[in-house]
Every structure is written in structure tokens, then in C-alpha cells.
Amino acid sequence: MMNVLSLFDGISVAKQALDELGIENTYISAEIDKYAINVSEKNHEDILRLDDVRDIEARDFDEPIDLLVGGSPCQGFSLQGLQKGLEDERSGLVSEYIRLKNELQPTYFLLENTRMKQECKDFISESLNVQPIEINSIYFTGQSRNRLYWTNIPIGDIEPAHYVYNHDWSDGYRPGTTRKGPPRKIVFTEHFGCLTASYYKGIRADGRPLLTKVEGVFDEVKEHARMLTPEECEILQGLPIGYTSGISNTQRYKSLGNAFTLPVIKHIFEGLL
């Protein structure tokens, strides 16, 4: 039985990955977003739940932690954002992950975050004493999503996935936007850009937030671009369809945009077998 502590747990994709791999676990999560917790509780009733990571101390645990997982908020680090880095309160939470790793001394650890300025990357690497591995979700799903993974879990080679699209996806993705005038040029792309927590507000085809209208896939019937449905976003994240049902679509998009990509985490966790 593996004792797992997941910080900034979100919708518990790490738990889903462990369970799908058949790795028996006692899973403890720390999360404060009520909508993410709602999704997690619906899918994983056996999780032991804590609250704010800033209130957690090593003495809270009777048993050693075998695996420490974290995907600390990345908005301040993101190259697409304001790039406040560690000065951003959300990104500064990575220091809580580092603190608990030092206090708990887990056998294995995994920290995920977005691509960031070199100085921020160096700080995390020096604190964890390991260099990150960059993995794009495009090797596992139909989404281009680059993320950095700091871990001491041995990671095997990645074989690019092959996609078979059904009638709903037959022409792949056709990003296009409208403002108040006619539609802009529609282009074909084999993969969708990075799904973000702000997708419900609309995003650009390259994954950056879009503040006017939305891009998504091309609707053959209505003959214009539409947003992806929450179910399609679940597919892009490698999750079972309906995993995030039970909350509003806005919160589903947000929770999915903040989540791990399941097949990527499964690939990493295969090193625990």
C-alpha cells in the first residue's frame, strides 16, 4: 500500500492514474476549491481530505509518505501570463510543496508546472535537486500542452500516440474566431492548443487566453467555429467522459484546464510499478 499526499489536488487526476494502474494507495488530498472537491468526491469516495496546504505539517501524519504529488498554481509562472513568477501569491505556493517535501522526505515526488522564466525554473530545480523533464500531452492525446515535471520517478520512453477520430472529430480541429464582423480565416490543425482554466472565456488557437469570442472546433451543421464541450475537454485530458459532471460548465472548463493530463501522469507513474 502506497501512502500518497497530493497537494493542490484539484480533481484528483493523480488518484485516477494510480487506480487505473492498479497501484494500491492511501490517498490524502489538499485542495480548497469547492468545485474541484465536488468532482473529486464524486469519483473517489475513499480519499482522505485536508484543506489549505499552508496549514499542513509533517506531524499531521502517522505514517511515512511514499509519494508526494503537486501541481501548484501556474498562472504567475506562465509565459503567456503576467510572469510575476514567485512574487505571485498563487505561484509562491510552490514553496509550500518544497517545504513539505523537505519535512516529509517522501520516497518519490512529482511536481508539475508550466513552462516559465529560467530564474523560476532554476529556483525550483535547485530546491528539489533535480532538473525538470518537459513532456507535451500531444504524445498522448489530441492536445498540445507542454508541462515541466520535476520528479525522481524513473520515466520510460514515450511512443507517440495515434488518433482515430470518430464522426464527431472526423475533420480534426478547425480553429477560427469571430468578433463583431465576419469570421476570420479558418485553418486546419491536427491538434488542439493547450486547454486552459480560462477556456470558458475563450482562447486563441495557440492556447493563449482570448478575450473577445471563442475558438474551438468547426460545427459542420451550423458552419461556424464552436467551443469544445466539457466532454470533449475531458477527452483531451484523457479522462473518462462525464468525470467532471455535476458542476456548471464554467467550473468544468476551469477544473479541466487546471488538471493534469491523465495519460501523461499514468506514464510517469508506471515507473512506480
Explain the meaning of each model-derived region.
Residues M2-D55:
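SAM cofactor-binding core of SAM-dependent methyltransferases
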Residues D51, V69-G70:
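Redox-cofactor binding/interface segments in oxidoreductases and associated redox assembly factors
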Residues S248-K254:
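Short pre-catalytic strand/loop immediately N-terminal to key active-site residues, enriched for Gly-Thr
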